[in-house]
C-alpha cells in the first residue's frame, strides 16, 4: 500500500508569514480549579500558532489532540503549560490560546441565608511572543449600581440598575477566580444573588441606597483594588451601567500597565 500524501507538509513558495492559523470556536468540556476543589464547565476554545513563510500548512488535528490529552483542572499555571505544549506539538515559535466558559459560585443570601448559584463569564488568554508567555484572566461581574445624583435630588429613592464590570488582568501569579470576583463585587453599590427572600430584598435595596456609585466611581474603586494586587501586572477595566432611566448605557474604562511605571 502506498503512503498517503501529506500535502500540508509540503513547502510554500509565496514567502508570506501567517501570524495566526488554527482552530476557532471549539466547544470542549473542561474542569476549572476553584478555591474549594474543581468545577466542571464547557469551554469555547480558539487556538492559533504562527506559520513561517516556508510552511504550507499547520497541523490542524494536533490542536484537538492537545485538548484530548489535557486532563488537569485549569488554572493559570496549567493554562500556561498547555500553551507551551501547543507550541512544541505544532513546531511553532509563537501562538495564542483563548478559552471562555461559564463559572458558577454558590452564594448565600445576606439575611435569610438561602443558597443559590450565580453565574459569571470567565476567560483565559495566553500568548507567546519572542519567547515570553503572557496570561490574561478575564471576568465579567454583574453588579448593582445606584446613582448618587438621583439619591441627592430625589425625595423618594434613587434610580438604580444592573451594571457589568469587566476586568482583563495580566497575571504574574495564580489568582483564584472567586477571589477576584469577590473583590470586584465589594466595590459596587451592591452585589447580585441568584435567589433572594423578602428580607434579603430589603437588605440589598438599602445596601445599594447607602452605597451610591457613578460609573466613574465603579472603575476608580476597582482600579484602586487592582493597583494594590502584586499578582496583577497590567489590566483593562470597563464598567457599563444599563441605565434604568435612559435608553443608553453609561460607560467608563481604565487601563494601566504597572510594568511601565
UniProtKB/Swiss-Prot annotation:
Keywords: Hydrolase. Pfam families: GCHY-1. GO terms for biological process: tetrahydrofolate biosynthetic process. One of its GO terms (molecular function) is GTP cyclohydrolase I activity. Its EC number is 3.5.4.16. Pathway: Cofactor biosynthesis; 7,8-dihydroneopterin triphosphate biosynthesis; 7,8-dihydroneopterin triphosphate from GTP: step 1/1. It is an enzyme of class 3 (hydrolase). It comes from the Bacteria. The record marks 147 as: May be catalytically important. InterPro entries: GTP_cyclohydrolase_FolE2, GTP_cyclohydrolase_FolE2/MptA. It catalyses: GTP + H2O = 7,8-dihydroneopterin 3'-triphosphate + formate + H(+). Belongs to the GTP cyclohydrolase IV family. Converts GTP to 7,8-dihydroneopterin triphosphate. HAMAP family: GTP_cyclohydrol_B. This is GTP cyclohydrolase FolE2. The gene is folE2.
